[in-house]
């Protein structure tokens, strides 16, 4: 052990990671143990007024942002095109410095099949107070579309009276206002206000338990997705996915030109949780969208859904994102609550590939502090994972295979634990070799070298992959080309402090040029 102990890379909670039981693992965690240098979890930031400028985006990239999320529930196409341009400008401005350069991905978050209320007294900014116990009439009569008040509220979902029944709940504005349905007419229902408050215009409506039959992809979504293809976004976060057919519909809209865009399905209601397996099968990844989920299912059950979804994604080897309210209090305060710190750490311990910030970076007062805080918590949590048990279980559930790349990936991760390697270096074109390594959750960062920009950007969705973009011309001698890419990864790893001369790294390469031939693993001392 003394020899492995001198490899400074792996001191991070190593004693705990190799315990025999989970209880023993917890007993051995040590607050004075230094976390790993690399952070393995991806950080997704929503870009909005607080973070749109090139200057701010540069700082966010330096602080650790990997994926920029654009929320298409708000803003025009011009606005989002400007944001995308700024993100790319900020990313490329750091390209001259290969150490700081990170290929940042762009994600388009669709509005999805939302139900919204009408305008209060004809104005977008007016508010009325709803009093507990009062009666509120919900109407589908378009005469009230721009003329709602404390007595009558118009909603834009025409089948409302068919899907709710007396005793149903209707939630408005993220669950802040709740209404209890008393009686139902042909184009209206009478409700009692259970929870009052100030109601503004065009607020979101949730109908927990109702079988809402809205199209998965609205006409606005179709325009937004086509815009995304033109803008060359890397991934789509598809809102309110309820079944596999919804995912296929999004794929169809993306079409041939957008066939390489990753589709991450957002699970936000009971039906989505119930039909999780078919959705996972059809998607490239999953987002646990805890905001709407916490209204659609009881708040005390959200953590169960989170653990179940993360577990099934880890088992299937697909990326999973934990989102909503992770550091919510940092919208207004420079430090998170203790509960939020715990929440971020536990999402990482559960096995999330990425953690997301919404309002914290889009409209908050402390966007940079929020990114740095997530980065710091994630590093500590990653060191505290019970790697010994996790690797054995992941290896056990992975199907038997004759695919050389899969077999090599398992071997490489096992070897990386055995020799406490500073990193696993992999050369990849499509990204698949790196994704397979990520699936087995090595402690060491996976430095994935590729010439394909999109492969590099999408790799941020997977835990532990540190993508680097290799921009030199292809060498005519293939073996020389392999060596120059491996050396490039070594230089970056040393400059970033992942390892130093004399440490060992594991190198995965193919036996011939092209995609799909990765089958050679070498254990190499760092020069």
From Swiss-Prot:
Its EC number is 2.7.1.40. One of its GO terms (molecular function) is kinase activity. Keywords: ATP-binding, Glycolysis, Kinase, Magnesium, Metal-binding, Nucleotide-binding, Potassium, Pyruvate, Transferase. Pfam families: PK, PK_C. Substrate binds at residues 69, 266, 291-292, 324. Pathway: Carbohydrate degradation; glycolysis; pyruvate from D-glyceraldehyde 3-phosphate: step 5/5. It catalyses: pyruvate + ATP = phosphoenolpyruvate + ADP + H(+). Mg(2+) binds at residues 268, 292. ATP binds at residues 71-74, 116, 203. The keyword Kinase applies. PANTHER family: PYRUVATE KINASE (PTHR11817). Homotetramer. Glycolytic enzyme that catalyzes the transfer of a phosphoryl group from phosphoenolpyruvate (PEP) to ADP, generating ATP. This is Pyruvate kinase PKM. It comes from Xenopus laevis (African clawed frog). The gene is pkm.
